[in-house]
């Protein structure tokens, strides 16, 4: 799937938004990918994750033994990637501000984990998720995401396999360009809700 095809899926779902957005990283952007709108359509989610699963298989073969995603944004693509790859799909969620496995989910030292995210911007949530997995003794071999907003600049600590890259400028709140300063900011993400 090409970058244009991926972005067309987001546009068709009404998920490629323009305005002034506060990202989960705290940075500001004039573009927001509202993946919840994409994930509300099972067929669209399946198409995107099927393409990502093919890309992961081309790079990793059968190496992953389990998929782990960070809640909340990674749960739907993590589930669909697990379905596409025939693997178990788990997720970590925040407890007292830190990601942890709950709900009876367990990993062992023999598990080779593929982390699945929706969108990667700075890689912070990814690194926090990977840190939680590392504490279990399992090995994170790579991360996969639908869109890498950093254009390949985010360091998640393991190889990052993105269905596409879509570099979108993001700014600290005190360094906004005039066009963003003129628009009220909204915070559409999920960080800080739990």
Curated annotation (Swiss-Prot):
5-phospho-alpha-D-ribose 1-diphosphate binds at residues 117-125. Its EC number is 2.4.2.10. One of its GO terms (biological process) is pyrimidine nucleobase biosynthetic process. Belongs to the purine/pyrimidine phosphoribosyltransferase family. PyrE subfamily. GO terms for molecular function: magnesium ion binding; orotate phosphoribosyltransferase activity. Homodimer. Orotate binds at residues 121, 149. Its cofactor is Mg(2+). Pathway: Pyrimidine metabolism; UMP biosynthesis via de novo pathway; UMP from orotate: step 1/2. Keywords: Glycosyltransferase, Magnesium, Pyrimidine biosynthesis, Transferase. Gene3D superfamilies: 3.40.50.2020. This is Orotate phosphoribosyltransferase. It comes from the Bacteria. Signal peptide: none annotated. It catalyses: orotidine 5'-phosphate + diphosphate = orotate + 5-phospho-alpha-D-ribose 1-diphosphate. InterPro entries: OPRT, Orotate_PRibTrfase_bac, PRibTrfase_dom, PRTase-like. PANTHER family: OROTATE PHOSPHORIBOSYLTRANSFERASE, URIDINE 5'-MONOPHOSPHATE SYNTHASE. It comes from Maricaulis maris (strain MCS10).
């Amino acid at each position: 799937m090409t970058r244009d095809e991926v972005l067309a899926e987001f546009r068709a779902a009404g998920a490629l938004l323009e305005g002034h957005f506060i990202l989960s990283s705290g940075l500001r952007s004039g573009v927001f990918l509202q993946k919840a709108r994409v994930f509300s359509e099972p067929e669209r989610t399946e198409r995107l994750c099927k393409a990502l699963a093919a890309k992961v298989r081309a790079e990793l073969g059968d190496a992953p033994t389990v998929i782990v995603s960070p809640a909340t944004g990674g749960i739907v693509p993590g589930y669909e990637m697990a379905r596409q790859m025939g693997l178990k799909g788990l997720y970590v969620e925040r407890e007292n501000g830190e990601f942890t496995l709950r709900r009876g989910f367990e990993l062992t030292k023999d598990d080779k984990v593929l982390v699945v995210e929706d969108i990667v911007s700075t890689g912070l949530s990814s690194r926090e998720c990977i840190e939680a997995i590392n504490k279990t003794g399992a090995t994170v071999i790579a991360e996969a995401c639908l869109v890498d907003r950093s254009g390949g600049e985010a360091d998640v600590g393991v190889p990052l396999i993105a269905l596409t890259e879509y570099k979108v400028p993001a700014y600290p709140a005190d360094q906004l360009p005039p066009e963003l300063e003129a628009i009220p900011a909204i915070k559409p993400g999920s960080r800080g809700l739990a």
